[in-house]
Amino acid sequence: MPTTRESPALRALSVAGIVRSIASFQDGIFEDLRPFLGFDYKAWVNTPFDKRLLVQLEPFHALLLPWLADHSIDRLAQLFEALPDVAPLVTETAIYYGHDDLVAHLSAHWRHKATSLRSMDLAAWAGHFSILKRLHEEDFGGCSHLAMDWGARGGHLDIVQFLHEQRREGCTTEAMNWAANLGHLAIVQFLHFKRTEGCTKEALNWSAGNGHLDVVQFLHTHRNEGMA
């Protein structure tokens, strides 16, 4: 009986690598990458650290995690090639949600594409000391005075101490003001004895208004800003 011979073209199209190579010359992006088109990088990076940023982080995180589970971490290469502006968003999402392994991978393999200028600020805001330490040690991403301000506000003494010892960005009076407002006495004490930025009248106003008597007593004894 005659046999049906497969054409060379069909044999070529059965090889996944060849198909991917052919597809790379076509316009558009792979179907699994299309959902990432819905995120505005420029708007994201200009959003301050409050609920407005969480509105963007939460849906991106909800998309990213199952996508990585379906395609493996190696698929990031295609994502970053097709949508390079998405790379820093992946980094910021990994930092905020504490995905240390993903942060380590991005630092090792994608530091030039996936760097965020506010990486350490975001880690401090989220209270992830181990990630902040990694970012510092591997020089992956940026840091500003907001890191210590947010570390103090969140009650993360380990972060405040580390930034004081290892970084030079410092903080603002907002660090002690917010630590006092939220009753973080140990941080108020550390900032008073170890740093020079000080506070404003708001520190005593807020701590008194919120009933943090120990903080009020400390500020009354050691500071001279007074209260309004």
Language-model region placement:
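Ankyrin repeat (ANK) tandem alpha-helical domains that serve as protein-protein interaction scaffolds
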Residues: M1-A228
